[in-house]
Amino acid sequence: MKVNTFWKLNAIAAAVIAGSTMLSTAATAAGATLEEVVVVGSRGAPRTVADSPVPVDVLSADELNSAGSNDLLMQLQGAIPSLNVHLQPISDAASMIRPANLRGLSSDSTLILVNGKRRHRASVIAFQGGGVNDGSQGPDISVIPSIALKQVEVLRDGAAAQYGSDAVAGVINFVLNDASEGGSLTVKQGEYQAGDGKTSTIAGNLGLPLTDAGFMNVSFQMRNVDPTSRSLQRPDAQALIDGGNTDVSVPAQIWGAPIVDDDVTFFFNSGLDLGNGSEAYMFGNYSERDVDGGFYYRNPNNRSGVFTYGWDSNAATRTNANGIAVNAAGQTSAEFVTGGGVVGDFVAQGTENDGTYRLVADLGGCAADVAGEIDNIRLVKTTAGENDPAGTQAILDGQRDALIASDSCYIHNEQAPGGYTPRFIGNIADTSFTAGVRGELTDGMLAGYSYDLSGSVGRNEADFGLNNTLNPSMGPDSKRDFSTGSYIQLAKTFNLDLQKQFDNTSFAAGYEWRETTFEVIAGEQASWQVGNSTIANPSDAVNGDGVAVDAYGYTEAESATAPEYNLTPAGLKAQELDEQREWSQATNIDLATFQPFNVGSHGFAGFSPDSAGAFTRRNYALYIDVESQLTDDLLVGAAVRYEDYSSFGDTANYKLTLNYQITDNVALRGSTSTGFRAPTQGQANVVNTQTTLVDGQLTQAQTLPSFKLGEGDLQPEESESYAFGLVMALGDVEITADYFNIEVTDRIALTSNAAPTAGQITSMTAAGIPNAELLGQINYFTNDFNTETEGVDIVATYGADLFGGSTDFSMAYNWTDTKVSNQGSSTSDFKVKRLEESLPNHRATFTMAQDWDGISAFVRTNYFDEYYAVHANWFGTDADSAVTVDAELTYSLTDSMSVSVGGQNIFDQDAERIDGSAGAVAEGEPGNVLGGIFYETSPMGIDGAFWYMKASYNF
């Protein structure tokens, strides 16, 4: 229904524009001027950019719209060098709501405001957020269309003492359009130079009077985006095709942008003069979109992707009484297999013991049915053709065909003969509503105070699904498409703000109450249930003599003298087939009795009823903010804020600021402050199971709350920051330069994947985690490491009459450097490198906007410094610096109508390429084994040049 509506509106808009005979102008702003008025940075009266004691950038809606993209995140990145946004081509929910980084910190370290009011965060948690954003849960900025905006104010300074949690890196305030008349309509069509990624957008804005004393301004944007692919065929998939498998997709795995369908967003902003200096206001939004992206390919002829890893990397150094290698729990590999039920690919292809294991489910009599074909029915391995790939493949094909032909055996080739690549789908719905009244009190002890009383509610829901996959544990009974559950984030806020001017001093104080709830809705049963093909602890197992045995194959008598078992899988090493056979012969237990298939929709397991629930936290805050013009040249300010949270307790923070006017054209400014970021309810309570790469192999890892692992409750991050800078107006040239330093302690992030310790297994069991001993890899949120981030921001603008018209130049430069000052015990060296080097240290933009009579042009050059590029969270390289150019040319047909053509990255600058398949991109690993062409963490994206046409009608 939404698709039909979209195209109908698109056609109507095109007709309106084509039929118009009215005159238009297309104004383009080069950047903020020092005289623009902003409300962020102080809780007192609004100030100009020049008078502000902290750095604030002001971006007009025209400047954002000239950036080419209709994605607000990309528009902001082009205008703000200290803001970085990564494409997430193969990821979890981060591909649906992309995180952005201001000043090198995580996306939830920047506070988002709309009309000066706190914006609710998204429900999505970026479990695979590209290093800096791992585990972040920030607001969904992409739902805000630039056509709904009057301007964007970017405070590049810590402001927790004024606004509360999250304002560590800074604050971005989106000011909605408040026009009471006129409007605009825009239709835009574009695609990448490679011929994919077609994007269709229609956007409109309408200003209306609300009686003769108010306004109602409404905006909408509707968008559809086709996917992109920057992929090669995976070598293993190509080998299958070369061997005659006609069911393999080309490419089997896609690296590129996801499909975005029916991306619809509506915003409204209204105000009504009540008389006596009072005004009522309301604003809000409704937004929804469908996202469909790809996951990793599952090869049908090996076990990668339908299992998790286990056993012990040090097993080769320990043996039992029989001389067989055992793990730390005293188990042989076979004993671990039968006890765990979910284990790994024991010998990977390309190793010394080259071969392929195939996981087989016994549906009843499987071993006897194909005994003549297969020596070990559960784990099929051949070494006879190690040096004869064709011979090896022939044996494997024969085994596969025998298993498929047997009614008593099952392998996943039967359902997916060409393998499968799961599709991660989601529906994101976002709503908000804010209402309030402001004015000036005229009676009582607060007479003369301006007041602002408001309440707001915001809700973000992400409904997840996984298509074209399996629940491996269900064997032949598995369906292929799953509804895996939902995340819901609900925020309620109440504010009372007071402000009064006392001669040269502005005094502000306020109260805030918030309630946030993170809710997990369970997925359908098939997405999380344990099927019959997984027997973790079979109660009816017997040995060859008919005597009952435990999960490790021991009788009750044998178990009394056996080692104390403690399943602590801690590695990804090989388990030898001869050990499996020796154990099987010694116990007379057929290994086919224990089928270690993974549980749940594979790739992103559904949320089980055990992990579902609603988790609520409340907090209140009191603040005071004072600014005083001590002399004509010196402005000083101080703010303090106290907050109390129902979860972790209270916190108090302060901020000191100054602005000193050295001359009429030169001013110094500076600030020092403390801040904090409270852990989100999602980070504190979420349970999630998904597939990730570990050393190039797919494995399932589970994210668990830290308190269920015995690691204690999450605590807030704490920060200390200071900044100082210079503001200059030299004729028509305006320059600001600022240095900043931010130290964050006890940063909240996801740990690296690791096997659970014995203590963690005990804690998980006590906390009610089912089958805790079977979890091969886990991670959790923790306060683990400290960072120090410093940098410099320089912004310069110049306007003049040049080239027969008016010309605006702007330059913005950012240097940011982050160091991990305390690594902690759970943060890997690889993650440290990503935290420190995955974002360019230097970024710059140079913009020129030219306006003639009826024609305007916009050109922006973007510079990206060297950075550490990473592929599949597996390996990385030092990427070269790069320059991209964006441009737009606009012709005014009439006073009201214009057409534009433009492009982003018009010279088609490539991202850093992964070495060719014949080369090595990591020690011992061939290149492009996953089919990627570019390192996907490129700050400029991997899709190349994008070209578009746009028609606009203003009225």
What are these regions (language model features)?
Residues 607, 611-619, 665, 675-738, ...:
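Outer-membrane beta-barrel signature, preferentially recognizing the C-terminal barrel domain
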Residues 72-75, 79, 100, 113, ...:
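N-terminal periplasmic accessory domains that precede
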